[in-house]
């Protein structure tokens, strides 16, 4: 195993030559211990057996040591042949970067270009470094030869902790305030304009009370599901594997044959069906999409609340639309009989027309989204998987991946999101069957 040694001595004429010296590392030096890494721009850190056994890394980077190394190449090579000492280079986030070219310590753009071009090795996990495996067919190659990363993928993943149903902070309240405003204001107006007149009339008092109860129940369901959907953690996880595990089980950052992937942004392996959200800056389990109106991702643990919110909002729009039409008919009938209307009723009639138009536009949009969610859930797919499936429909092997998510029937597929107890499907309760199953160490989100 080879690592590149980069001395961090600025102003040294031999810095480029010393940065390409190779150090042979024995796996026994790792001892399956976690290696804690400080942060710094290309910090050269010397590690010996005692440091590894104590799970510590002592930063012994000083100019005297680097000057001695730069002035005497023979001594430098002798030190590198010592299997009890190694040098690793870290960027600010603790990621080891092979030095393909010499660049300044403050050149973040060039560092990012290396990462984007997959020039980095296995990244760190929770501020711990996973020493990478680099191809080395010839130990005598000169400093201009580039090193490529192995593309072998990991075979197991274990010791993974799932954080279920954690409440996250309400965060930005802008979009959420708008949604609550759009729910409550029409309801209050309809309650006073369309329902209240029925309650003051003896003949229609019972009808008014029934409509009051139904409208209140619908609004409570909308607000409750909206709150749960926006504040429930959609599903996150913490990789607790020892960093030294990835020495023997490197993993690719792109899709492989077994579809195990490494997230270069989160610096850990992504479980199956997990995707990284650029807005939440984390990987979300069984991610469907990120909703700006909720300021949250729709994923494993809150998709039911999202679908219920769309469902009750659609029902409420239809119900309120019916009440407004009935109230409009009453006003028009009153006008035809009395040949006149008070100015107050004329104002209400004008607002009625505007509100009806808003309900029609909102209803079409929300019902279309609800239909899309129902169609995808019935197939056992998420929105992201559906879009990937359309883009890669010519790849049979890729399409076969999603067939295992289909449980064979619509009821079975719905039970994955809503739970096995069908009589609780329309209530904002936690699905009783959300769990993580493990088969031969691989994580499957069901």
From Swiss-Prot:
The keyword Electron transport does not apply. Residues 56-81 have a biased composition (Low complexity). Glycans are attached at residues 5, 8, 14, 21, 141, 145, 159, 165. It is found in: Membrane. Its main location: membrane. One of its GO terms (biological process) is protein targeting to membrane. It catalyses: L-cysteinyl-[protein] + hexadecanoyl-CoA = S-hexadecanoyl-L-cysteinyl-[protein] + CoA. The keyword ATP-binding does not apply. One of its GO terms (molecular function) is protein-cysteine S-palmitoyltransferase activity. Its EC number is 2.3.1.225. It is a multi-pass membrane protein. Residues 261-311 form the DHHC domain. The chain crosses the membrane at residues 178-198, 210-230, 305-325, 349-369, 410-430. InterPro entries: Palmitoyltrfase_DHHC, PFA4/ZDH16/20/ERF2-like. Keywords: Acyltransferase, Glycoprotein, Lipoprotein, Membrane, Palmitate, Transferase, Transmembrane, Transmembrane helix. Residues 1-33, 56-83 are annotated as: Disordered. GO terms for cellular component: endoplasmic reticulum; Golgi apparatus; membrane. The DHHC domain is required for palmitoyltransferase activity. Belongs to the DHHC palmitoyltransferase family. This is Putative ZDHHC-type palmitoyltransferase 2. It comes from Dictyostelium discoideum.
């Amino acid at each position: 195993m080879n690592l590149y040694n980069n001395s961090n001595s600025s102003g040294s004429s031999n810095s480029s030559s010393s940065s390409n010296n190779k150090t042979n590392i024995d796996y026994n030096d790792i001892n399956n211990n976690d290696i804690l890494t400080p942060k710094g721009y290309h910090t050269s850190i010397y590690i010996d057996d005692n440091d590894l056994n104590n799970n510590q890394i002592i930063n012994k980077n000083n100019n005297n040591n680097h000057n001695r190394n730069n002035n005497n190449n023979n001594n430098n090579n002798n030190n590198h042949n010592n299997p009890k000492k190694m040098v690793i280079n870290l960027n600010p986030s603790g990621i080891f970067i092979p030095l393909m070219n010499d660049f300044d310590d403050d050149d973040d753009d060039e560092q990012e270009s290396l990462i984007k071009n997959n020039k980095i090795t296995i990244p760190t996990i929770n501020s711990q470094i996973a020493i990478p495996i680099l191809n080395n067919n010839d130990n005598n190659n000169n400093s201009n030869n580039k090193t490529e990363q192995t593309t072998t993928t990991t075979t197991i993943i274990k010791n993974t902790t799932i954080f279920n149903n954690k409440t996250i902070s309400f965060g930005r309240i802008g979009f959420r305030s708008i949604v609550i405003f759009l729910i409550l204001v029409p309801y209050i107006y309809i309650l006073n304009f369309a329902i209240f007149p029925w309650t003051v009339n003896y003949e229609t008092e019972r009808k008014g009370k029934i409509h009051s109860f139904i409208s209140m129940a619908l609004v409570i369901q909308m607000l409750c599901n909206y709150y749960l959907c926006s504040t429930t953690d959609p599903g996150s996880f913490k990789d607790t594997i020892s960093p030294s595990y990835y020495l023997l089980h490197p993993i690719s950052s792109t899709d492989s044959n077994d579809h195990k992937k490494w997230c270069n942004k989160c610096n850990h392996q992504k479980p199956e069906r997990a995707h990284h959200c650029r807005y939440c800056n984390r990987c979300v389990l069984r991610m469907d999409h990120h909703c700006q109106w909720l300021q949250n991702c729709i994923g494993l643990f809150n998709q039911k609340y999202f679908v219920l919110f769309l469902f009750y909002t659609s029902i409420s729009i239809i119900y309120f639309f019916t009440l407004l039409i009935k109230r409009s008919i009453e006003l028009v009938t009153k006008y035809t009989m009395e040949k006149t209307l008070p100015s107050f009723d004329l104002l209400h009639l004008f607002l009625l027309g505007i509100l009806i138009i808003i309900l029609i536009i909102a209803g079409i949009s929300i019902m279309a989204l609800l239909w899309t969610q129902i169609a995808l859930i019935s197939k056992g797919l998420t929105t992201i998987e559906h879009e990937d499936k359309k883009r890669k429909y010519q790849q049979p092997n890729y399409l076969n991946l999603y067939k295992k998510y289909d449980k064979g029937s619509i009821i079975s597929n719905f039970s994955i999101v809503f739970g096995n107890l069908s009589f609780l499907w329309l209530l904002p309760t936690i699905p009783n069957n959300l769990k993580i199953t493990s088969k031969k160490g691989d994580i499957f989100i069901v």
